[in-house]
């Protein structure tokens, strides 16, 4: 651990189109090999597709999708006396948003649609409706935490 304390969090600037820091975070998650303009094109096209399909503000759709994907509990490994236990722990707000965005992008990359724009758009729409692989991942994470509730007293 550094002696000067934890590194300060850099401020996240809102994106120029939707004025939302969430969209900036999504662009950063889609970003590969530093190709920011390509990532922005993908995200903006996916959000426009969401607007066309639902007729609502795409940032609202993104927030609804994130609310359906954000985990409240996760398990962390804790070694006690030679045995490793999966200890359920509450997830901080920032981490839950980061995990939700990571899962959305990861599972949209695994989808079968032809372009990344279609994959991301359909994963966002599915997640906002409570469907999709990213929502299933959250449910699996909660199920894992629920089944290991007996080890909650090992929390740190």
Curated annotation (Swiss-Prot):
> What is this protein's gene name?
rpsG
Write out the transmembrane intervals: none
What GO cellular component entries does it have?
Answer: small ribosomal subunit
Which molecular function GO terms apply here?
Answer: rRNA binding; structural constituent of ribosome; tRNA binding
Q: Describe its assembly.
A: Part of the 30S ribosomal subunit. Contacts proteins S9 and S11.
**Which NCBIfam families does its entry note?**
rpsG_bact (TIGR01029)
Family of the protein in this entry: Belongs to the universal ribosomal protein uS7 family.
Q: Which GO biological-process labels does this protein carry?
A: translation
**Keywords carried by this UniProt record:** Ribonucleoprotein, Ribosomal protein, RNA-binding, rRNA-binding, tRNA-binding
**InterPro entries in the record, alphabetically?**
Ribosomal_uS7 (IPR000235), Ribosomal_uS7_bac/org-type (IPR005717), Ribosomal_uS7_CS (IPR020606), Ribosomal_uS7_dom (IPR023798), Ribosomal_uS7_dom_sf (IPR036823)
The job of this chain, per UniProt, is described as: One of the primary rRNA binding proteins, it binds directly to 16S rRNA where it nucleates assembly of the head domain of the 30S subunit. Is located at the subunit interface close to the decoding center, probably blocks exit of the E-site tRNA.
Any idea what this protein is called?
Small ribosomal subunit protein uS7
Q: Does the keyword Ribosomal protein apply?
A: yes
């Amino acid at each position: 651990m550094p002696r000067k304390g934890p590194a300060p969090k850099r401020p996240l600037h809102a994106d120029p189109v939707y004025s939302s820091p969430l969209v900036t975070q999504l662009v950063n998650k889609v970003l590969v090999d530093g190709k920011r303009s390509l990532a922005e094109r993908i995200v903006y096209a996916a959000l426009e597709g969401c607007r066309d399909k639902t007729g609502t503000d795409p940032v609202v759709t993104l927030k609804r999708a994130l609310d359906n994907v954000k985990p409240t509990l996760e398990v962390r490994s804790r070694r006690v006396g030679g045995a490793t236990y999966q200890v359920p722990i509450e997830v901080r707000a920032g981490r839950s948003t980061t995990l939700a965005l990571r899962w959305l992008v990861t599972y949209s990359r695994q989808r079968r649609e032809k372009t990344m724009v279609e994959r991301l758009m359909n994963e966002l729409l599915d997640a906002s409706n409570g469907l999709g692989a990213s929502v299933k991942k959250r449910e699996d994470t909660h199920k894992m935490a629920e089944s290991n509730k007996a080890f909650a007293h090992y929390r740190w």
